[in-house]
UniProtKB/Swiss-Prot annotation:
Stored PANTHER family: UVRABC SYSTEM PROTEIN C, UVRC/OXIDOREDUCTASE
Domain UVR residue range list: 203-238
Localization per Swiss-Prot or TrEMBL: Cytoplasm
Biological processes per GO annotation: nucleotide-excision repair; SOS response
UniProt GO MF annotations: DNA binding; excinuclease ABC activity
Name of the featured protein: UvrABC system protein C
Residue ranges of the TM segments: none
GO cellular component: cytoplasm; excinuclease repair complex
Length: 607
């Protein structure tokens, strides 16, 4: 048996220098990561007899081991702390759930470059603008660029194989550089103006366009003057919508709000006085978490764990924390740029601050209301199934295909707080008879629950299968084959009328059949999860089917293997454009002889 943790013995050998500490339980699971200016003093504070917060007391009660790492200074300790939190995600740390890469606007190289949304590593040659707080904010900007400057946004493979202008030209969203309807110099000017807008230099851009309009009018080029007038009008309209009153420079306004049910951090991004967008974050927090702790943890994880994120020149926050000086120093050292942080602000900045606080409060209230709604449905389901307590994890499976083609199985997961989308899975089904839903479900469940033997994944409390007695029986067989610990099986079959609200339910085996009233919260939960599984399955199936059909018509052509199929489709920009091409045009594609072009053409046009 492991000896109990002795705080006095540990503290007697603990250093008083800056560093990072890691707390483990008796199973050597990492519970918490922290940093300190003085390790000995900070760790001693955990073991005082009174005054500990409930969360801290619960943490201390589980400590079996503490490890420390001494660092050169507090800044280095903070950077190491954020690295460890991101890697291990300890349960007692405040965790920022949203860690996806943020989107950028990407401007490609070339004579007629395109604007597009980009996520991930910046490997392509070109220019990047952002990051933006959401993809929606980027789509707004790209839409404006199309309307105002008519710059292209189509894929290069599509652009290179156009023989006539597309619909975007007809509706005045593109100048059709693909077919030479705009000179390179004119297009380059449109791109330069677009870049000025994305860089937040809207006022300078408007002044430049106004001067150009006056110049065009003075030379009686009224068509050009009218075009510039329309561009100025659009830009001013957007400036009115997106500008922060009295705003200039690059500012992030961050407000944290906490109540007993959770926490929300609302961030408003202002660049060049223009609002790029805003976003809500819902960190994973413990009971009775202080709002200042939430703010400090958020800023550290947001700016230190993801160095690619854009750094403003100023942060406006609604609370202060004693760690802010060290935090700002660490951010500046990591980024090599100056950053100021403000709390007591007046005038316009105070209104920005209050706006962020209001948004955080409202977002958390809406989230908690929805959580309570879902939690109430889970409680109702527990009552219907005679469970001692509500289930914590419910998985639902569904199958989608088109007459056996491109079969996909889906797995969606719900908890009392709603859908757990990071746990969703899709399974491409292979090697079963086309249209055999039982075999497809058998394969999906086998693949899912086989991983439990390897210690991967969590066991659900309830397994929901979209289907009747047959699917339920098959699911039970899979669980028995894999010796999966007993769990509740629930089958959902459409009733005699096949209308929503008249479903027949099967519990654990086909003999236990029952129905619920149409207004039952438990039935509503079952319907919600089943419909989500169906949606997730059918979107996966459609994507797989589309990918298959793009290549299937070429698969029977001798001499056209997978690589050549990909190259052909990339060269022509898709199967539709390839189908329109003549034999001579196909023969011009790299690696395609005249004879092979004839075979491809014949295959594409055979009845």
């Amino acid at each position: 048996m492991t000896d109990p943790f002795d705080p006095s013995a540990f503290l007697s050998t603990c250093s008083g220098r800056p560093g990072v500490y890691r707390m483990f339980d008796s199973d050597t699971r990492l519970l918490y990561v922290g940093k300190a200016k003085n390790l000995k003093s900070r760790l001693a504070s955990y073991f005082r007899k009174t005054g500990l917060a409930p969360k801290t007391a619960a943490l201390v009660g589980r400590i079996a081991q503490i490890e420390t790492t001494i660092t050169a200074n507090e800044t280095e300790a903070l950077l190491l702390e954020q690295t460890l939190i991101k890697e291990w995600r300890p349960p007692y740390n405040i965790l920022l759930r949203d860690d996806k890469s943020y989107p950028y606007v990407f401007l490609s190289d070339g004579e007629f470059p395109r604007f597009s949304i980009h996520r991930g590593a910046k490997k392509q040659k070109g220019k990047y603008f952002g990051p933006y707080p959401s993809a929606g904010a980027i789509r707004e900007s790209l839409s404006l660029l199309q309307k105002t400057f008519m710059v292209r946004q189509c894929e290069d493979s599509y652009y290179k194989n156009r023989t006539r202008p597309c619909l975007q030209y007809q509706i005045k969203r593109c100048k059709a550089p693909c077919v030479g309807l705009v000179e390179a110099e004119v297009y380059a000017e449109d791109v330069r103006h677009s870049v000025m807008f994305l860089e937040g230099r809207s006022n300078a851009l408007t002044d430049e366009l106004s001067a150009g309009m006056e110049q065009a009018a003075s030379t009686l080029d009224f068509e050009k003057a009218a075009e510039l007038r329309d561009q100025i009008s659009l830009l001013r309209r957007v400036q009115d919508q997106q500008s922060m009153e009295g705003g200039s420079g690059d500012v992030d306004v961050v407000a944290a709000f906490v109540n007993p049910g959770g926490a929300c951090v609302h961030l408003i991004s202002v660049r060049g006085g223009r609002v790029l967008g805003s976003k809500n974050f819902f960190p994973q927090v413990g009971i009775e978490e202080e709002v200042a702790e939430v703010m400090s943890a958020f800023l550290g994880q947001y700016f230190l764990s993801s160095p690619e994120r854009d750094l403003p020149s100023e942060l406006i926050v609604n609370v202060v924390h004693e760690d802010f000086p060290a935090l700002i120093a660490a951010i500046q050292e990591l980024r090599g740029r100056e950053l100021s942080i403000s709390h007591r602000v007046r005038g316009t900045r105070a209104r920005w601050q209050q706006l962020a606080v209001t948004n955080a409060e409202q977002a958390l209230s809406a989230r908690l209301a929805n959580r309570q709604h879902v939690a109430a449905r889970f409680e109702a389901l527990a009552e219907v199934l005679n469970l001692d307590e509500p289930p914590q994890r419910l998985e639902c499976y569904d199958i989608s295909h088109s007459s056996g083609e491109a079969t996909v199985a889906s797995c969606v997961v719900f908890g009392p707080e709603g859908p757990l989308k990071s746990d969703y899975r899709r399974y491409n089904i292979e090697g079963v008879t086309a249209g055999d839903d039982y075999a497809a479900m058998h394969q999906a469940l086998t693949r899912r629950f086989s991983k439990l033997k390897d210690g991967e994944g969590k066991l659900p409390d309830i397994l929901l299968v979209d289907g009747g007695k047959g699917q339920l029986s098959m699911a039970r067989d899979v669980l028995n084959e894999l010796a999966v610990p007993d769990l509740i099986l629930l089958g959902v079959a459409k009733g005699a009328t096949r209308k929503t609200g008249f479903e027949t339910l099967y519990l654990n085996d086909a003999a236990h059949e029952f129905t619920l009233k149409g207004d039952s919260p438990a039935l509503h939960l079952i319907q919600q999860i089943r419909d989500e599984a169906h949606r997730f399955a059918i979107t996966g199936h459609r994507a797989r089917r589309g990918k298959t059909r793009r290549t299937s018509t070429l698969e029977d052509v001798a001499g056209v293997g997978p690589k050549r199929r990909r190259d052909l489709l990339k060269h022509f920009g898709g199967l539709q454009e390839l189908s329109r091409a003549s034999i001579e045009e196909i023969a011009k594609a790299p690696g395609i002889s005249k004879k092979l072009a004839e075979l491809i053409y014949a295959n594409l046009h055979s009845e």
